[in-house]
Amino acid sequence: MSAQYARRCGWTCHLPFDPTIPPNLRHWVTGEGSLTARLVAASERFRVRRLFQASARPFLDEWQVLGQCGREPALTREVLLICDEQPAIYAHTVVRERHARRDWPFLRGLGERPLGGRLFVDPAVRRDPFQFARLLPHHPLRQALLRILPAMAPVPMLPARRSVFRRGAGVMLVTEVFLPDLLTRPSRGLGQRY
């Protein structure tokens, strides 16, 4: 995907300054390594709630990242990462069907286990640099999130990041939307691998 197209969709190579993103939340969004490991370190009880996993049409800016010629269905997984019974992250993963079978075979059987628990222990997995966005209420990911968490409706903007993971010829796009719980949850556990 071209950098120009990504910018038009709101995705940039750095998190834009926004006074509504305080330093603690910015630290969560821009931190390196496994977000799962950082969330585990910052909570007494961590769990994954799988919301959806099936073949679905990716959003316009996703299918181009995946290298698809059109909006053919892709394996889509949506989960909430929950810290101390508070939703902290809405995660949205898309991968081409044939890549899911060949390069990411564990994905279909993951259930309510964290994806990060598999990605960061596999030496064959490479991660591209992050792209960041400020998701406004009209963004398709916000609309999907609203169906799950209607309480997010009055929140004017949610920061998000996404990254492409590569394994063999397979490309997987993982997008993480950072929810208000992380405004006050201390970010620690940087440098851990999970």
UniProtKB/Swiss-Prot annotation:
It is an enzyme of class 4 (lyase). GO terms for biological process: pyruvate biosynthetic process; ubiquinone biosynthetic process. One of its GO terms (cellular component) is cytosol. It is found in: Cytoplasm. It catalyses: chorismate = 4-hydroxybenzoate + pyruvate. InterPro entries: Chorismate--pyruvate_lyase (IPR007440), Chorismate_lyase_/UTRA_dom_sf (IPR028978). Pathway: Cofactor biosynthesis; ubiquinone biosynthesis. Its EC number is 4.1.3.40. This is Probable chorismate pyruvate-lyase.
